[in-house]
Amino acid sequence: MVRYDPEKYAAVADNFVYVHRALRRDLSRIIEGGAELFERDFPRFARILAKHTELEDSLFFPALEERAPGSTTMTTAPHQEIESLAAALVAEDSGGDPSERLRALQELLVAHLREEEELVMPAMMEHFEAAEIWALDGRIMEFCPPEFMQEMLPWWFTHIDAEDRVAVAQNMAVGVPSEVLPVLCQWISAGLDEAEWGALVARVPALTSGAV
């Protein structure tokens, strides 16, 4: 079992572990839910996937390429193929069964996310100090308008398990400006039921600043 520096792992985990898990779980749920669920929820999934790809292509990967040229080259073609397939599924208006193309997307996405976790994430930890990764992470809001965050945060916390929620919330509690945290907490709580939110706040008391 590979052991990583815990500070560096915490810094990269939001983007390369916890978002990846949510993407896998939500796509599986949509596939299993049939046509009605696809029509309702896949457009949101596609928007969040597109923003995740944009953040990697515009923020994290260029920084890594400066330190380790060629280390993200393997992501270019999969990003393009996955985004093209997702966009085509959103644009589809024939009313046909999307299940075959959804499973093709799932196969591509799962393989690609695994590749990033096995190759890109370790490279980030090798070539950056934890503080440098946190600094990159702190720039995410430059790429994400408030309306996107209001949609993404409830989605994210819905599709990760209780332990992952705690890890992400702890990162937010120490990394997000104090004046911003209450708003993020309100958006997160909107995606959880009362018991789930209460359990999370009990583990991460700083979230009470955003309780409603």
Annotate each language-model stretch with its function.
Residues 1-212:
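Small-residue-biased structural context
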